[in-house]
């Protein structure tokens, strides 16, 4: 994988709260390398707002969204619950988000459900 794409963090989510999240497939336009990242921000009212924000942060990459949902994050209890879907992008494979979240939050109890909105 290219050094450039490795500089993009795999996971960036807000602290305690419920918020929308998306999975983003990032592709380095020069090398063709790809990777999946997770972003979730309470400040974004729509899933596409998250994608728009990420697009402005990194140049030389293309971004596609395989889907989104919501995350319920409790820092005090060290729990993350990934669930639901995005009306704009559909429902992703939440297990892929959980894999990435477990790398960033190894001491957390992280679960997911395909139910809910």
Predicted segments — roles?
Residues 1-117:
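Intrinsic low-complexity, intrinsically disordered or marginally ordered coil/linker segments
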